[in-house]
Amino acid sequence: MVGIDPCATSWRMAQKRASQLGVPLEFVHGSAEDMPLPSESFDTVLMTFSLCTIPDGHAALEEIRRVLKPEGRLVFCEHGEAPDESVARWQARINPMWRKLLGGCNLNRPIVNWIGKAGFGIQSLDQMYLPGTPRIAGFNVWGSAQREC
């Protein structure tokens, strides 16, 4: 298993947890938009709550597609733009302040649309507002997509 992250603090936390669990894990310093990894070298990529803060989500998804083997799978769990128009309008209104206050996190990214545009076919998809979470921040999508050749 290989993990990539631009933040050394995140590496240390993940390495400690992986060691506790006995999981062999290789850490690579880098960004999702320009991974220092060979093309077509992974069967599966797991991405969780990342696209909200990655500066160029499109480039990150293109890089994920590049490092996946033909017909490789992307498994994702993300939050993003709500399907309800009124909620999406509020997300757009408060996103600039939200992004500044919360480390670059964006509320209103159209995750599923981006995945499709990056050359993936959605295989499974679930979505919902998380219970107990304000609707402007609680719309989540999760599923899997296959790299299209």
Per-segment meaning from a language model:
Residues 58-70:
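A short glycine-rich, Lys/Arg-flanked "PGG" loop and its adjoining helix->strand segment in the class I
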Residues 71-79:
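Conserved beta-strand signature within the Rossmann-like core of class I S-adenosyl-L-methionine
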Residues 33-45:
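A short acidic, Gly/Pro-enriched loop at the edge of an enzyme's catalytic core
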Residues 120-123, 127-149:
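Core SAM-dependent methyltransferase catalytic element
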Residues 79-84, 130:
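Short "lid" loop at the C-terminus of a central beta-strand within the Rossmann-like core
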Residues 43-56:
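A short SAM/SAH-binding and catalytic strip from SAM-dependent methyltransferases
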Residues 1-34:
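Class I SAM-dependent methyltransferase SAM/SAH-binding core
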Residues 103-119:
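Short alpha-helix
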